[in-house]
Amino acid sequence: MDKTTFQNPDIVKFINEKFYAVKLDSERKTDITTPEKVYKYVKGVGKERGYHEMAAALTMGRLITLPSTVFLDETFRVLQPIPGYKNPETFEMIMTFYGDNHYKRTLFTLYQKSYVPLEQLKLKLISE
C-alpha cells in the first residue's frame, strides 16, 4: 500500500486533513508506553513469528494480517481494523466513511451504494 494507495495525492491530502496517521511495525521489539498501559513485544514459539501487543490490541485480538489499517475515533476507540491490501479506490471509500463521520449515521453497506469518489467530487466542483 505504501507504493500504491498511499502515493495517491487525494488519499494523502485527505489523510493529512482528517487523521493522525501512524505507521506501526507489528513486529516492533521495543515497548510502546501510553498513559494506560505499556505494550510489549511477544516472542513467537517455535517457528511462529512474534507480534507486538499494541498491534494485537488495535486489531481487536484478531490474527494480524499485513498490511492492516485501523481507524480510531477522537477518543482513541477502535472503530474498525481493516485487514489486507486495499487498492486506492477501495481505501478511499473506507477512509471517507470514517474520516467524514458517515459511520455515525449509516451502515457501510448503504454508504457504498451512494459513495462518490473524491476525483468526481473535484470535477463536479470545478464544473459548477
Where are these regions (language model features)?
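Conserved redox-active cysteine motifs that mediate thiol-disulfide chemistry
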Residues: 1-6
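Thioredoxin-like thiol-disulfide oxidoreductase module
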Residues: 9-80, 88, 93-100
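Thiol-/selenol-based redox modules, centered on thioredoxin-like
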Residues: 78-128
